[in-house]
Amino acid sequence: MPKTLIFGHKNPDTDTICSAIAYADLKGQLGVETEAVRLGEPNGETLYALEAFGVSTPRLIEKAANETDRVILVDHNERQQSVSDIDDVQVVEVIDHHRIANFETADPVYYRAEPVGCTATIIKKLYKEHGLDIPKPIAGLMLSAIISDSLLFKSPTCTEEDRQAAKELAEIAGVNAEEYGLNMLKAGADISDKTAGELLTMDAKAFAMGAATVEIAQVNTVDINDVLARQSELEKVITAKINDNGLDLFVFIITDILENDSVALVLGDKTAAFEQAFQTTLTNHTAVLKGVVSRKKQVVPPLTEAIANVN
């Protein structure tokens, strides 16, 4: 039997990469042959974490069915966010912390989803449930994932379970979570060498919202104006993405990791739904979103509801 591949979503973030690696370690300790792989290039933040704990970057795959018939999804479940030939393989497990949408299987599946801030928090619990030890590098990667998804425990998605898991993982990894976390986030916020196209795909996800197709990209920075200075260039790339991919709306969330606020750059036919969702008026295609840092909890739910209500 070919080994089972474990991967997160396209345009991978730190949780997607690190949780795939961690879950592959857990399954290996249980005697199951798996391999963590990735569906895109890791960002600077993720590379910082991998280097800090001496772990190799998983290999890149474009398709899965040419080498296995069984896959495990972490940090996502929506098909449009997954490997391109997801319909040609059997999803045997899902470990996730997002909404469930556009997902079905022909066979029974082990599905573990919890309303926590990070997939790694769930995997930490699975190690405990199976009575397994967490290796130091794996603990460091799972800590990195929690710090990333919670913006160093400041995001509204962060739960007490996430904080407790991070505390225990930091002890195993032998690091100070606050100090290490800030350095990691700053590494990810250094986007000076990124093209407009790279900024818009570093952390982008497609969503089916009713009959509408929406893409929401997000980038972390320490100065929003540095990103907005490139607005004209960004809008050209966004317009091309809308036309090429048949999108109804593209939302680019630029998040200040120091102030915990965001600015959204919004284009497409459904901009009225965005304005309704956030009770705002777009000015030059942008809107300030005070206190908004989480795509999952603060952007997707109100936008999904608004699109359903706006013609």
From Swiss-Prot:
GO CC term (a single one): cytoplasm
Catalytic activity: diphosphate + H2O = 2 phosphate + H(+)
Domain of life: Bacteria
SUPFAM superfamilies: DHH phosphoesterases (SSF64182)
Enzyme class, UniProt record, top EC level: hydrolase
Entry note: cofactor: Binds 2 manganese ions per subunit.
Binding site for Mn(2+) 2: D15, D75, H97, D149
InterPro entries the record matches: DDH_dom, DHH_sf, DHHA2, DHHA2_dom_sf, Mn-dep_inorganic_PyrPase
Protein location: Cytoplasm
Keywords per UniProt: Cytoplasm, Hydrolase, Manganese, Metal-binding
Disulfide bonds: none
Binding positions for Mn(2+) 1 per the UniProt entry: H9, D13, D75
MF (Gene Ontology): inorganic diphosphate phosphatase activity; manganese ion binding
Family: Belongs to the PPase class C family.
HAMAP family from the UniProt entry: PPase_C
Name by which UniProt lists this protein: Probable manganese-dependent inorganic pyrophosphatase
Lineage: Bacteria, Bacillati, Bacillota, Bacilli, Bacillales
Gene name linked to the record: ppaC
